[in-house]
Amino acid sequence: VGYSYGSISNCYSSGTVIGDSNVGGLVGGKDSGAAISSSYFLIISGPDNGYGTSLTDTQMKQQSSFAGWDFFTIWDIVEGQAYPFFKSGVGTGTPDDPYRIATKADLLTMAADASYYNECYILTADINMEGQVFTTAIIAASDFTGTFDGNGHKITDFTINGGDDVGLFGQISFGGSVKNLGLENFSVSGSDDVKGLAGYSAGSISDCYSTGAVSGSGEVGGLVGYNENGCNISNCYSTSTVTGGDDATYLGGLVGDNEGTASNCYSTGTVTGGDNSYYLGGLVGDNEVTVNNCYSKSAVTGGYNSVFLGGLLGVNGGNISNCYSTGTVTGGNSSSCLGGLVGDNLGTGTVSNCYSTGAVIGGDGSAYIGGLVGYSYDGTTSSSYFLITSGPDNGNGTSLTDEQMKQQGSFVDWDFDYVWHICETTNYPKLIWQIVPGDFVCPDGVDFADYSFFAERWLNTDCASNNNCDGADLDLSGTVDIADLAIMCDYWLKGF
């Protein structure tokens, strides 16, 4: 400004100023009543006449130099690289107009201000954290009670070496929700409540996944460390490696300790505990409430004197229904309570309509080993089965041969219309939500057999009255056409 009669706040200038009189880096001159606050100029751009604060080039690239500025809704900065610039279309934090996060700088700015943790956010791009190392959860200043919508995007390449409650979020509290978010190529290590997404959650988590490495001593999960009562985790998965050292407890491929609900979820990573480790599960270390419509392919391994190891759950004190596990369960010498599905089914625990096929192996001196459940003290098991060669038949569950496991008639009282699917004589049962669009016929997976089925119904127009043309009308438009073919192509050679 050449001469100011009014007020100037939260402004800066960096261009060169040349003149003979009334020259300043920010303002040339001003009226006695004019105010200037929180405004700055580049020290080499022009004379410092006392109007505004001069900053070096390095200081101009540091957020901390600009006292009182709003770097959440108005300004943005790439630390060490650029001067402040205006955010573009950042939103207002409401459900209809969430704050938009497009860059690493946006995410770190949001994480730094806990006063906004009750607002709504949406990712508008994938974010690469560029290998940055943190010592706390990234979003950790307070409990998160807002909504964080990943919008189908992912956050990648970060490392956290901290204590308790570490992960992307430290704590998701009641009312908070995270959805549609992927976490990839990360490493998180800590003590208790350690995970990829949330150390502690009492909110809701849906349609999220993690593919990284997580390690800690207690309540360690590929996605969530501790899932509080009332929290629902749905349509999520983890392929992460979960590791605990000696004396580790509550390790799960998806959740370390579950006192909420997990549904339509799966895990395919590994869960490994050291000597004297307790509560190790392919999906959940300890379940006290509900797990349904889930599966695990995770291998579970414990060291010497490890206790409560299960292909799906280490310990179950709640309800498990319509679940299965296929991973190997291995305990070291003197281990106990090892089960293909559940290590220990407590008196309050129920297991219904489940099966397991993974081998259950205990070292020398191990006790309480079962193909389905390792040990059950007054727990209930119904309509649940295990592969006869996988582990001992201790009376918990019904053993089936490989041939019987591939026959629908073997699974008494199971719902093969809306819950389960089986390609008889070919595969063991799968949950119906696992069947991908375009997989019309057996065997499982979208291939030329399905294409032939689809071609026979090409351009049929009576789908609304014909069971959606036997399912070939994938977009439910009433006609089997190019739009349905495009959907089928998206899943080609998937679902096996």
Regions found by a protein language model. Give the residues of each.
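Surface-exposed repetitive/solenoidal architectures
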Residues: 1-436
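Cellulosome-associated attachment modules in secreted, modular CAZymes
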Residues: 433-496
